[in-house]
Amino acid sequence: NNLLGFEIGDLTTGKMLHRVEVQGFNRGEVKRHGCPSHGIALTPDERELWLCDGANNRIHVFDNRVMPPVQRTSIAVRDMPGGISFSLDGKHAYSSTGDVIDVKTRRIVATLEDQQYNSVQSEKIVEIHFRDGKPVAAGDQFGLGQVRKKTEAK
């Protein structure tokens, strides 16, 4: 669809609870995915929701601690984003545009380039931590949040 925003639904009932549209930007044409807001992710602490905007070359940041989430800021990226993921420690966001964003300051701190300074872009970004030459932790390309609800012991 052409929604520049997202919807929140109740998985049990199938009912839509909230429809959140990006404010201050117009929907526009996109080159891929057919939808201006294809990529969406939660920060690992789940306090924020980050939404890709392929029509305006932006990532919009929403406060996810309130319902419906409230738009707080927008970050300009160098090309049309189609995905976003986060570092395991939650300090950096990786846009499919190759921009690495400091989550706290909202500033681009690095851009991925090849040896000839060409832009490197991918929706498939995986963070792997090594210790003594062996992988000990791995992220994934999905910004699903990392908060785990405590369950009662039986």
Tell where the protein language model's regions lie, with residue ranges.
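Predominantly soluble domains enriched in secretory-pathway, periplasmic, or organellar proteins
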Residues: 1-154
